[in-house]
């Protein structure tokens, strides 16, 4: 796979209020460091200089975040009103996301609901990472839910691997990476939460991709599905052998699923057979949260959420 460049910006959804880009792997969203010669913000400014907003720190309002190593769907609001409508959807947990990943080992169950609370790791040398509740040094763990559905079993560079669809039902920092690791099936190429690998054997990227995104704002339903990057034709190291569930069927279920009710506490799982906790009515927005929203509308922070 080719590394990112200023020219290879892929747009998968565009309207007068929003863009959804297919972010390249190993690409930062934005940065104040002069050494970062290529960021998504710089790509956008290069391709859409007329859409840059001089009132923001980076010129564009990113509605959510992806890790440096994660590729896939990322939504950009093109004005303050659009950013506010997207913020409301995220606040009310009405956004639907689905990711593709290659994970180590053959996951035996076709569907798993991962329910581990996640907190910040306070252990010396690991303070930039997250961990599950019960881990030494885990601070302020919060309830976290991820639905995992197995698509294929196969080999990656000769090692057993499963291709999975991940649907986060909550939105904690590094949630998918932490949950897969806690399940005993770390994401291939995840050097932070995965298995220690020899330098020569490391894959060219972390195998996590934001595949599907839906943000049901009041004015429009922002919906985008990005190309699947984990195909043998694109990566000869990946050799699937068994199909467990067809991806097309699961994505069709996502597309036809009704938008989550803002009072239900979040999106529903892909399969109605798996019961999920249903939190009560969300509490009113506090003054601190309101101030945070206003700051969010004017500029962007750098902390990743996957």
UniProtKB/Swiss-Prot annotation:
Disulfide bonds: none annotated. Residues 255-290 are annotated as: Disordered. Belongs to the pseudouridine synthase RluA family. InterPro entries: PsdUridine_synth_cat_dom_sf (IPR020103), PsdUridine_synth_RsuA/RluA (IPR006145), RluA_PseudoU_synthase (IPR050188). Residues 269-285 have a biased composition (Pro residues). Keywords: Acetylation. One of its GO terms (biological process) is pseudouridine synthesis. One of its GO terms (molecular function) is RNA binding. The modification N-acetylmethionine is found at residue 1. This is RNA pseudouridylate synthase domain-containing protein 1. It comes from the Eukaryota. The active site is at residue 67. Pfam families: PseudoU_synth_2 (PF00849). The keyword Acetylation applies. The gene is Rpusd1. SUPFAM superfamilies: Pseudouridine synthase. It comes from Mus musculus. The keyword Acetylation applies. Transmembrane segments: none annotated.
């Amino acid at each position: 796979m080719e590394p990112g460049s200023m020219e290879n910006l892929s747009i998968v959804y565009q309207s007068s209020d929003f863009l959804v880009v297919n972010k390249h792997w190993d690409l930062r969203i934005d940065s104040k460091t002069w050494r970062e010669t290529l960021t998504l913000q710089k790509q956008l400014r290069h391709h859409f200089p007329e859409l840059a907003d001089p009132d923001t720190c980076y010129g564009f309002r990113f509605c959510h975040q992806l890790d440096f190593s994660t590729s896939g769907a990322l939504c950009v609001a093109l004005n303050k009103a659009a950013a506010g409508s997207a913020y409301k959807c995220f606040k009310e947990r009405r956004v639907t996301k689905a990711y593709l990943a290659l994970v180590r080992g053959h996951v035996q169950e076709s569907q798993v609901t991962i329910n581990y609370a996640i907190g910040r790791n306070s252990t010396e040398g690991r303070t930039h990472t997250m961990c599950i509740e019960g881990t030494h040094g885990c601070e302020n763990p919060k309830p976290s839910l991820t639905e995992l559905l197995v698509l294929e079993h196969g080999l990656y560079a000769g090692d057993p691997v499963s291709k999975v669809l991940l649907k986060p039902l909550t939105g904690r920092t590094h949630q998918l990476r932490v949950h897969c690791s806690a399940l005993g099936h770390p994401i291939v190429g995840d050097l932070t939460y995965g298995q220690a690998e020899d330098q020569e054997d490391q894959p060219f990227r972390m195998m996590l991709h934001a595949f599907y995104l839906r943000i049901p704002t009041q004015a429009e339903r922002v919906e985008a599905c990005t190309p699947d990057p984990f195909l043998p034709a694109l990566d000869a190291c990946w050799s699937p052998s068994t199909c467990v569930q067809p991806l097309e069927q699961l994505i069709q279920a996502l597309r036809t699923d009704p938008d989550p009710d803002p009072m239900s506490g979040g999106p529903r799982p892909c399969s109605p057979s798996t019961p999920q906790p249903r939190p009560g009515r969300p509490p009113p927005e506090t003054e601190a949260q309101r101030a945070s929203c206003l700051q969010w509308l004017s500029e962007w922070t750098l902390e990743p959420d996957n």
